[in-house]
């Protein structure tokens, strides 16, 4: 799947046709693309709401256009950085998962992974869950989603 996204981005960057992005507020950061099982794309990104609050938004590209962006979550506790940023993942059918990092303590690298799921194509989202329970405050991140052998959502970090 990652090869498909890379090839798609390469082909789009080498072609003349314009490929519009979803409507995002100025200053939006850290977009991430994921393919869907029916050949579409999902994109998630951070939008700054004010001086301390951010929202995690998403949009879907299908039938040659992007859907109106919707908010997955908003918080002032996000751990926002250039190296490890939120993702969105198409589990299958109308099921989607997303993740972000959230501060868990006062230390520079005290953060946890938060995961949400939607079973109605992003109309509503579950409460955020932390997929690890090792009891440490720091450096949980770089999560990757996958479908396991039963086609259920899997995660590794």
Q: What residue ranges belong to the model's regions?
A:
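Extracellular, repeat-based ectodomains that mediate carbohydrate processing or recognition
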Residues: 14-157
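Generic cytosolic/nucleocytoplasmic N-terminal low-complexity/intrinsically disordered segments
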Residues: 1-2, 64
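Sec-dependent N-terminal signal peptides
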Residues: 3-13
């Amino acid at each position: 799947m990652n090869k498909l996204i890379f090839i798609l981005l390469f082909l789009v960057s080498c072609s003349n046709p314009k490929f519009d992005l979803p409507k995002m507020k100025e200053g939006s950061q850290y977009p991430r693309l994921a393919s869907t099982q029916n050949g579409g794309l999902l994109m998630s990104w951070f939008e700054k709401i004010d001086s301390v609050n951010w929202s995690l938004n998403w949009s879907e590209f299908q039938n040659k256009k992007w859907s109106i962006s919707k908010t997955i979550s908003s918080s002032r506790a996000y751990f926002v950085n250039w190296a490890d940023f939120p993702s969105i993942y198409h589990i299958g059918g109308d099921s989607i998962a997303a993740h972000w990092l959230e501060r868990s303590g006062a230390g520079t690298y005290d953060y946890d992974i938060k995961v949400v799921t939607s079973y109605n194509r992003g109309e509503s989202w579950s409460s955020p869950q932390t997929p690890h329970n090792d009891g440490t405050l720091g450096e949980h991140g770089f999560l990757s989603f996958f479908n396991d052998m039963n086609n259920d959502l899997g995660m590794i970090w």
